[in-house]
Amino acid sequence: AIADGTSMITENVFEARFRFVEEMIRLGADARTDGHHAVVRGIPQLSSAPVWSSDIRAGAGLVLAGLVADGETEVHDVFHIDRGYPLFVENLVSLGAEIERVSS
């Protein structure tokens, strides 16, 4: 979402995969979905917000979006990420990310 231009993404297998777009919009993304397609327009900056992960990829994407957003972003339901990306937080910290896992 932080980029110039417009991108169109097509999902031919699992239409519900775009559920995370609503969460990206909470962060300020300029995005919309229509069936099997999502259109994302680049913006200069995302804002912090609480967001909820609906699956593995969505969770990882929301964490990465939160890292570049202004302010502090809370990503809920991160257990989805654990199923596919072991040591996700630790790996991001080793790359210099300012991220913390907090128990609910």
Curated annotation (Swiss-Prot):
Among the GO biological process terms of this entry, one is:
cell wall organization
Which terms in the Gene Ontology molecular function aspect does this entry carry? UDP-N-acetylglucosamine 1-carboxyvinyltransferase activity
Q: Which InterPro entries match?
A: Enolpyruvate_Tfrase_dom (IPR001986), Enolpyruvate_Tfrase_sf (IPR036968), MurA_subfamily (IPR050068), RNA3'P_cycl/enolpyr_Trfase_a/b (IPR013792)
Pathway recorded for this protein: Cell wall biogenesis; peptidoglycan biosynthesis
| Keywords for this protein | Cell cycle, Cell division, Cell shape, Cell wall biogenesis/degradation, Cytoplasm, Peptidoglycan synthesis, Transferase
| One GO CC term on file | cytoplasm
Task: Report the EC code(s) recorded for this entry.
Answer: 2.5.1.7
Q: Which Gene3D superfamilies match?
A: Enolpyruvate transferase domain
Disulfide bridges in this chain = none
Compartments in which it is found: Cytoplasm
Catalysed transformations (reactions): phosphoenolpyruvate + UDP-N-acetyl-alpha-D-glucosamine = UDP-N-acetyl-3-O-(1-carboxyvinyl)-alpha-D-glucosamine + phosphate
Please list the residues that bind UDP-N-acetyl-alpha-D-glucosamine. Answer: V13
Q: What class of enzyme is it?
A: transferase
**Short name of one Pfam family for this protein?**
EPSP_synthase
Q: Which PANTHER family match?
A: UDP-N-ACETYLGLUCOSAMINE 1-CARBOXYVINYLTRANSFERASE
* Primary role: Cell wall formation. Adds enolpyruvyl to UDP-N-acetylglucosamine.
The record's similarity note reads: Belongs to the EPSP synthase family. MurA subfamily.
This protein is called UDP-N-acetylglucosamine 1-carboxyvinyltransferase
Q: Which organism is it from?
A: Mycolicibacterium smegmatis
